[in-house]
């Protein structure tokens, strides 16, 4: 007869598998580590997750995470409202902010087009983006999706649609490596890509 772990532990392992890059073995190691060596850390993690799920929402304007209705960037009167930078994730937005080269506003897609995974225009809030970009204030849309196949397809789709509405559309320059994700690229490279962006 084989021994099964307690159901509470199995449930924890399954929950940890929801994290990106965490497979069954890694989830099991993390769960055992937390229960054996860091129960205080496990409790803090649980409280932080609960607090985040209860208090974080999407900004009504740019769709990033915020605790208020409108995020800090969208509320900043020093920002240039004629520039709108489209990124895939809040992590990409933070990387661009760290370059200190961009002073416009953002729209966060919360993903990228991936038909094989069932992610279409609706799932990346395409209609909200089009409404935001067509507000009469935005003059240039900077497409800062990642240089992966899905990111390029997303940029192409968005670029075609937004150009058809008379907007100037630019794309980050290729300082970012092919297949590269902004979250993992250094700030200097991203800054150069932003400054050298090209018209689509």
UniProtKB/Swiss-Prot annotation:
Superkingdom classification of source: Bacteria
Record's PROSITE patterns? RECR, TOPRIM
Toprim domain residues:
82-177
InterPro entries attached here? Answer: DNA_Rcmb_RecR, Rcmb_RecR, Rcmb_RecR_Znf, TOPRIM_dom, TOPRIM_RecR
Any GO molecular function: zinc ion binding
ZnF locations on chain (C4-type): 59-74
Q: Kindly state a single biological-process term from the GO annotations of this entry.
A: DNA repair
- Membrane-crossing ranges are none
What single Pfam family name could you report for this chain, choosing any that match?
A: RecR_HhH
What's in the keyword line of the UniProt record?
Answer: DNA damage, DNA recombination, DNA repair, Metal-binding, Zinc, Zinc-finger
Q: What biological function has been recorded for the protein in this entry?
A: May play a role in DNA repair. It seems to be involved in an RecBC-independent recombinational process of DNA repair. It may act with RecF and RecO.
Recorded family membership: Belongs to the RecR family.
This protein's name? Recombination protein RecR
Q: Which organism is it from?
A: Burkholderia mallei (strain ATCC 23344)
């Amino acid at each position: 007869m084989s021994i099964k772990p307690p159901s509470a532990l199995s449930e924890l392992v399954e929950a940890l598998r929801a994290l990106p890059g965490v497979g069954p073995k890694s989830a099991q190691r993390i769960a055992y580590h937390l229960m054996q060596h860091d129960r205080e850390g496990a409790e803090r993690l649980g409280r932080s997750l609960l607090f985040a799920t209860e208090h974080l929402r999407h900004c009504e304007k740019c769709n990033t995470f915020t605790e208020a209705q409108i995020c800090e960037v969208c509320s900043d009167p020093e920002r240039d409202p004629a520039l709108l930078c489209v990124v895939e994730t809040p992590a990409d937005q933070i990387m661009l902010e760290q370059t200190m080269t961009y002073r416009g506003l953002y729209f966060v897609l919360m993903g990228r087009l991936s038909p094989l995974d069932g992610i279409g225009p609706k799932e990346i809030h395409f209609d909200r983006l089009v409404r935001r970009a067509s507000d009469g204030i935005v003059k240039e849309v900077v497409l800062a999706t990642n240089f992966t196949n899905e990111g390029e397809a997303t940029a192409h789709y968005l670029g075609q649609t937004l150009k058809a509405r008379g907007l100037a559309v630019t794309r980050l320059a290729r300082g970012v490596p092919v297949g590269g994700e902004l979250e993992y690229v250094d700030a200097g490279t991203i800054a150069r890509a932003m400054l050298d962006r090209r018209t689509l």
